[in-house]
């Protein structure tokens, strides 16, 4: 393979779409804390001065959606109108209904193992050995840049930083291996008084250099820091935000295929979310076991049916055993029925708000990031 470039982006917790994702998942967590069997599909819309929370929720729990919303926005950092959004004064509207009984009858079963999928759909999982967290490098470092922006902002060391930010990193590959970083884009919302010269210098020294490995940077690396020259108006004042609008940021940065289903605001009976987590778990364990350098898995479901309708594995010519054998190993060691994967990954807990910014994958404390099946897979494969 010749040299090629590959780019991924990320956005901060203060990006409008990510505000919406975090509110949806904060509502989900609050409900799961009281009622682990709740059915939740929570969507959020944010715009200047208002938040609208809607969806279908069936639960025995009671939660204060307005308080959850304000607390989430406050924790992100939108606490005065100068930033374009204020947790204390924004309107919070709620339009919540119940899950359709037509869907419910296909999901709930007397035998939990026969729990049906909450919808039809296809989901992908992916892993690669190019980083220590078995994730593609471009999206990994794009996330780390905006995470660093948030840390610096919240520490107060750069008081002119504001919550809304975006990053983008272009990697150069040579024969499939990382050869360096070709370009870095970082745009951050800021207060009126900071000069562009001071902003450029501070972003480079306090955000970019501490995050990106020096060995991948060179005199040829291009830097684009607030390339429009001004980013004072941001957050929901600059753009409206919606739950589920950053599905590539949430997953693999475009390095793997995506089934189209968003994650945030959905309880684990929704295979859009839970099966995508399980697919990552499978792919990561295959790579951790040394059975392939790269692995992409597709699973699909029919609404109301427990067993997946298909399982497909792609290893891009890096497999150490046949993909047919890998598929048999997956069926043997991983239960990909909805109830099975919920139990396998212990998903009925309030763990979701943290997933809603900086990527659902590649952060080791989430249960789908465990590599506890790797040794078994390797032994069963005869390696």
UniProtKB/Swiss-Prot annotation:
Pathway: Amino-acid biosynthesis; S-adenosyl-L-methionine biosynthesis; S-adenosyl-L-methionine from L-methionine: step 1/1. Binds 2 divalent ions per subunit. Binds 1 potassium ion per subunit. L-methionine binds at residues 56, 99, 239, 270. Residues 99-109 are annotated as: Flexible loop. One of its GO terms (biological process) is one-carbon metabolic process. K(+) binds at residue 43. Its cofactor is Mg(2+); K(+). Homotetramer; dimer of dimers. Catalyzes the formation of S-adenosylmethionine (AdoMet) from methionine and ATP. The overall synthetic reaction is composed of two sequential steps, AdoMet formation and the subsequent tripolyphosphate hydrolysis which occurs prior to release of AdoMet from the enzyme. Belongs to the AdoMet synthase family. This is S-adenosylmethionine synthase. It comes from Pectobacterium carotovorum subsp. carotovorum (strain PC1). The gene is metK.
